[in-house]
Amino acid sequence: MNIILLGPPGAGKGTQAKLISEKYSIPHISTGDIFRKNISNKTPLGMEAKSYMDKGQLVPDELTIEIVKDRLGEEDCKNGFLLDGFPRTVKQAEALDEFLQNKSSKTDAALLIDVPQELILERMTGRRVCGECGASYHIKFITPKTEGVCDLCGGKLVQRKDDTKETVLERLEVYSKQTQPLIEYYKNKNVLLALDGTKEKNEVFENISNVLGAIN
């Protein structure tokens, strides 16, 4: 089964991706991971991508597409895959569909984990990490015994720059601009499956399993 995973930052995609990957025995392919692997292994594609990233530029669609296609050609993808972080644009989605059609395959489902902005802000801006040992906390969901102090090492808990309200709102705006056309694209292909991401993680996964079971 070939699955695309869509959803805003803070929607819990990573958690669900791990569960889906285990249940359906398909690799969870994160574009961030395959970029890092190509750069670490100094592949020609990785070095080309690094040249853009070092200048603070976006990696062009064509190069991103080639890196993803290269990964999808590996043996562990023969029975399907779960793509997370790709496609980000309609152009990338069209290139993926063309690649799959050439292999007599297709996108089976585009899962959209939907979470309202207020809840994402609560989830992400409430995150805290220990400045000493890196342990994770949340001011509402995973609280330390003593406010602002790590249970494990006594270090000071801090908010990462990525988790400030301003940064989260910027990321949500970028996501909205990028993803809305993709949502329409997959809706028109009749493969978009929207799920309520506000539920507890096991309930979200149960709903995902039900909708995937209906098409599998």
Swiss-Prot record:
Per UniProt, the keywords (alphabetical) are: ATP-binding, Cytoplasm, Kinase, Metal-binding, Nucleotide biosynthesis, Nucleotide-binding, Transferase, Zinc
UniProt binding sites for Zn(2+): 130, 133, 150, 153
Q: In the UniProt record, does the keyword Cytoplasm occur? A: yes
Describe the reaction catalysed, as an equation.
AMP + ATP = 2 ADP
Where in or outside the cell is it found?
Cytoplasm
Segment LID: which positions? 126-163
UniProt-listed Pfam families: ADK, ADK_lid
| Main location, first listed in the record | cytoplasm
User: One GO term of the cellular component aspect?
Assistant: cytoplasm
Q: Which CDD domains match?
A: ADK
The family database entries (Gene3D superfamilies) matched by this protein are listed as: P-loop containing nucleotide triphosphate hydrolases
Disulfide bond entries: none
Amino-acid positions noted as binding ATP in the UniProt annotation, renumbered to this chain: 10-15, 127, 136-137, 199
- What EC designation does it have? 2.7.4.3
User: Where are the annotated segments for NMP?
Assistant: 30-59
Pathway membership, UniProt: Purine metabolism; AMP biosynthesis via salvage pathway; AMP from ADP: step 1/1
What PANTHER family does the entry give? NUCLEOTIDE KINASE
Could you describe the subunit structure of this protein?
Monomer.
- Please describe what this protein does: Catalyzes the reversible transfer of the terminal phosphate group between ATP and AMP. Plays an important role in cellular energy homeostasis and in adenine nucleotide metabolism.
| Notes on the domains | Consists of three domains, a large central CORE domain and two small peripheral domains, NMPbind and LID, which undergo movements during catalysis. The LID domain closes over the site of phosphoryl transfer upon ATP binding. Assembling and dissambling the active center during each catalytic cycle provides an effective means to prevent ATP hydrolysis. Some bacteria have evolved a zinc-coordinating structure that stabilizes the LID domain.
The family note in this entry says: Belongs to the adenylate kinase family.
Q: What's the name of the protein?
A: Adenylate kinase
Organism of this sequence: Clostridium tetani (strain Massachusetts / E88)
